[in-house]
UniProtKB/Swiss-Prot annotation:
NCBIfam families: dapA. Catalyzes the condensation of (S)-aspartate-beta-semialdehyde [(S)-ASA] and pyruvate to 4-hydroxy-tetrahydrodipicolinate (HTPA). This is 4-hydroxy-tetrahydrodipicolinate synthase. The keyword Lyase applies. It is found in: Cytoplasm. Its EC number is 4.3.3.7. It comes from Shewanella sp. (strain ANA-3).
């Protein structure tokens, strides 16, 4: 099973909006070098909403190619039409991903019954492990632990990314879903507590720019060393909040560009590049986190 420090990888782009595959390869190498445990390709932070399906699949496939078996790659397969999610899942099943991460259908606000039916249909279209993804701040639907529990019996649904920031859900999910079901935090600010309460890993935005420190924090928390985890995590807390001064992934792409990790901080419309009033805030947070900028 995939656990530990997982990066929700940005998708680097050129100034004309095309995907910058040279920078993508460098990012993959960077995370392998820094000890990141796994990569999520083309999730929310990877701008899945603005990549058409053929491009989405290509980016995931290239990420797998660059990883070359050295780090697991999880492909984003969420969509708000079940038929589209199934089509995407079938395509991603051919490119070598270790698992897939499927966000709850957004905008159309399915009922719990609809969520269960959606995920069962998607899981039935592949043998590859599936991770559910609950982020109501983005989707306008909150998949409760009781709904997640209805999907545990599906053999290739292996876990859930819980991004509400409500750490009380860890215990409830564990009670309902059992010890073998993987619980991933999707909220950097509460990730340490999530792991200390029994979570298995974190799918992180900040991990794009502080992978070594984030990996060390996750390892300490998973080992039950709360004091060490806190000592690593506390200097990063300003970064966690500032990376959401505007909609993710606007700030983290700007930060990655300032670090020289990517050639350009371009982001696709309707998102726009980081506003000037946030530049100083983010630079200050990066300095406090001991991040070097170029």
């Amino acid at each position: 099973m995939i656990n530990g420090s997982i990066v929700a990888l940005i998708t680097p782009m050129n100034s004309d909006g095309s995907v910058d595959f040279a920078s993508l390869e460098r990012l993959v190498e960077f995370h392998i070098d820094q000890g990141t445990d796994a990569i999520v390709a083309v999730g929310t932070t990877g701008e899945s909403a603005t990549l058409p399906m053929n491009e989405h699949v290509t980016v995931v496939a290239q990420t797998v190619k660059f990883a070359a078996g050295r780090i697991p790659v999880i492909g984003g397969n969420g969509a708000n039409a079940t038929s589209e999610a199934i089509e995407l899942t079938k395509s991603l099943s051919k490119v070598g991903v270790a698992a897939m991460l499927g966000v709850t259908p957004y905008y159309n606000k399915p009922t719990p019954k609809g969520l269960v039916a959606h995920y069962k249909a998607v899981a039935a279209s592949t043998d590859i492990p599936q991770i559910l993804y609950n982020v109501p701040g983005r989707t306008a639907v909150d998949m409760k632990p009781e709904t997640v529990a209805e999907l545990v019996a599906v053999s290739n649904i292996i876990g859930v990314k819980e991004a509400t920031g409500d750490v009380s859900r860890v215990q409830r999910l564990r009670e309902l879903c059992g010890n073998d079901f993987m619980l991933y935090s999707g909220d950097d600010a509460t990730a340490r507590e999530f792991l200390l309460l029994g979570g298995n890993g974190v799918i992180s935005v900040a991990n794009n720019i502080v992978p070594k420190a984030f990996k060390a924090m996750c390892d300490a928390a998973l080992a039950g060393n709360a004091e060490l985890a806190a000592s690593i995590d506390e200097p990063l807390r300003g970064l966690y909040s500032t990376l959401f001064c505007e909609a993710n992934p606007i700030p983290v792409k700007w930060a990655a560009h300032r670090m020289g990790l990517i050639e350009c901080g371009h982001i696709r419309l309707p998102l726009t590049e980081l506003s000037e009033q946030c530049h100083g805030l983010l630079l200050d947070a990066m300095t406090r986190a001991q991040i070097e900028v170029k």
